[in-house]
Amino acid sequence: MDAVDLHFDGLAIEVKTSGVSQTWNQSGSSTPRFGIARQKRAWFAKTDDWVVYDEPKRSADVYVFCLHQSAPATNENVADPESWSFWVIATSTLDNELGDQSSVGISTLDQLAEPVDWSGIKAAVQRAARR
């Protein structure tokens, strides 16, 4: 795994996913949480180097949180962008507002950012990068 999930327009982006319904628990809904723990080290695929940080940190510039809303989750609705909600948050916001917190839930995401649909992700990433 690289230090971040993808690079776009010079930005390092971490993508986190969860769902209201999980394949291992179709009878009930889950309480989605996303891991945001600061890391002590990171691997960079481009150079095949491990970097050890003096202080744990989040390597991305921006986080994109993706929540699959449909229940039950099916192959069809998981592939449908309309079944998902997205929150795009600058890492600096996570650092300032949540500090060393290692995970985040939906209510906190709603406090930090407005959800966007699939077509709004690119603009939201660009806005978050300016923060």
Segment roles from a protein language model:
Residues M1-L11, T17-R131:
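Nucleic-acid endonuclease domains
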